[in-house]
Amino acid sequence: MKISVVMAVYNGEKYIEEQLMSILSQSIMPDELIIQDDGSSDSTTDKIQSITEKSDVSVKLIKNKENLGFSKNFITAISAASGEYIFLSDQDDIWKKDRIKRALSVMEDNENILALSSAFDLIDEDGVVIKKADNSKKLVNISQKEFIKHPKFPGMAMVFKKELWEYLQHNGKVDWESGIAHDWAINYVALKKRGMYKLEESLLCYRQHSFNTFGTAMAGGFNQKDKRIKLIKSLMDNARGIKAESQSEEKLLEGIVSFNEKRINFYEHDRLLRLLLHEFAHMKYISLRSIMGDIYTNLRGRNR
């Protein structure tokens, strides 16, 4: 059994050392670490080389000649991985010591799992815990309804089987040029195969700071409307990036796009009441938590 860790980096000098040390001190070590740098202009790659040259883990540092962007950087890095199990990593988080050990144990005990997300604690820029995750250790098979309403399964908390990635690369279901997020695509296809799961156990700490959108949302909502709109547009890109295999799937994906187009329109014109009426009338596409986030962001924007 071979284990790969894939990390995409860009100007991550502030936290990269702490993240790498947490990966290279796991109770079960990875067999290879694939790091793809997207044209950093700071000391990120120097710090990576300084730390990894002392490790017994096989490290492949790829330096892009041109900037690919976050998702494409990850997509090409994943394709370079050879492990049976592929863990994704951001450049600024902290893995708990047994992350690999615990995730592999769950996947080996449940062969139908294709992609596994774990819970995570939220920390601030200084590593102080802001919010602790549910640690019930419950294993949940994610339904299509849950995934579509609130796709809260970021790549940095994921591990998946290489066979799933190979299927994604060769079956033509995903249009990688559409702007689709790599983690959303992986989870969606695993979901279609009934192999998407979440372990309600915190296996890492996710760092929330001014440069990562997901962390800001987890901390209690976006403080800028344009960031919220950017997030909603990404949901549309994700749906557009999937090639439907049936009429029902086509209807679902078109519904996601149409719902979020109107959502953005109401957002941009500060029509909060119409936004809420629209959202409550289409609860199949949005969770109550996301609606509350929309209210928070809209009202906060008006008070600025």
Model regions and ranges:
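A conserved acidic beta->alpha catalytic loop
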Residues: 37-46, 66
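Short, well-formed alpha-helical segments that are part of the catalytic scaffolds
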Residues: 12-25
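Conserved nucleotide-sugar donor-binding catalytic segment
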Residues: 141-220
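Flexible acidic/His/Gly-enriched loops in nucleotide-sugar-dependent glycosyltransferase catalytic domains
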Residues: 72, 100-173
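Short aromatic/hydrophobic "clamp" motif used to bind/position activated sugar donors
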Residues: 86
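Cell-envelope/extracellular polymer assembly enzymes that use nucleotide-activated donors
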Residues: 2-4, 32, 185
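Glycine-rich, basic loop-to-helix element that forms the pyrophosphate-binding segment
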Residues: 64-81
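Acidic helix N-cap motif at the loop->helix transition within catalytic regions
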Residues: 17, 42-51, 72, 98
